[in-house]
Amino acid sequence: MKPQWQQYIHIIKQVVKPALGCTEPIAAAYAAAVARALLGVEPDSIAVQVSDNLYKNSMGVFVPGTGKIGLAIAAAAGAIAGNPDAGLEVLAVITPEQVAKAQALIDAGKVTVERTETAEFIYCCVIAKKGDREALVKICGGHTLIAEKRLNGESVFSVDSTQAKATGSICEGVDITIESIYRFAQEVPFEEIKFILEASELNGKLSDEGMANPYGLEVGRTMKSGIAAGIIGEDLLNKIVMLTAAASDARMGGANLPAMSNLGSGNQGIAATIPVVLTAQCYKVSEEQLARALIMSHLGAIYIKSHYPPLSAFCGNTVTSAAASMAMVYLAGGSFEQSCFAIQNVISDSSGMVCDGAKASCAMKVSTSSSAAVRSFLMALSSHNVSGQGIIATDVEKTIKNIGKMILNGMSSTDVTIIDIMSA
């Protein structure tokens, strides 16, 4: 197999992985679980310091297994019940008794959370204490990337800042473009990429859960009611929007099921998966074709998102849905050129969507970007595309660079303003 393809598979396996619960509070739970393990006993106090963006994305989302919202319960639950070896599934097993113990720690004023000044977008430092013993765990650059561990003030592990690599820079130094992703997905041996089919299984179960039970705003179930009442039809567009939103409903509502995440985001993993799976069902393609389309969607999303910080004022579901739309064109028998048209169309349609934290209404944003993916792939199949208008260039690679430039240079102050509004 080509070395370039091996790199691509390595990238996907690094950042397309199961995650239980919204990844920002789960980062705090993971850090707390590692700190508890380092301490050797359950702590009697926990101090949490996080970056503004991690704080923003933890304010309104439920922590799985707890029925509660926020960083304090995430950290306390991680320290009491977390599995430090489980990564983003750190809270996969937690009992009501452990939740009560975590809440008691919070009620006693023994868990503190504060924002801290840092240049890192993903940053979480947890200090766990028991008597005169103290363990510090610092996460930096990625939701499970441990940068430092200290026990009683002594360093037991550290990563040099020049060696640390944030998840957002995962494509740095890699020969990768939309065209190379497209060719790779079409030509790589099926056996090498079969693993991606787990995304369909995990995110499909989340969607089923969101349809079966009331979570969050019940976006998916509301659409189902509209179909049952004859107000809207059960066509491909509405089915994609309904089932994608339902998975996000369940995830944001604290369902105790993992999502197959994409670059640290469960919702974006959902957006990269479910529209592609439903399109594959519509066109009755083989399992192999579905796997190739999922690889195209997930790696395409990773590549586009590598052009800007992992957390920002920009809602990443937009570009994730652009990559999904590219894969949908492939499933429908369209050309590479038409797949590029789909990316251009989605970015033109919904690139103004901001991120104002992880919460129940994220399901609405997921449904918005997924509906754009359907419209855009249909337009692309008819060779209708946005080109040379606004931030959309005549070339898809230039458009992707424009998105990165807009976010890096134009949206940092937007992010600050959003966080200030949310914290007021």
From Swiss-Prot:
InterPro entries: Ser_deHydtase-like_asu, UPF0597. One of its GO terms (biological process) is L-cysteine catabolic process to pyruvate. GO terms for molecular function: L-cysteine desulfhydrase activity. HAMAP family: UPF0597. Belongs to the UPF0597 family. This is UPF0597 protein Shew185_3080.
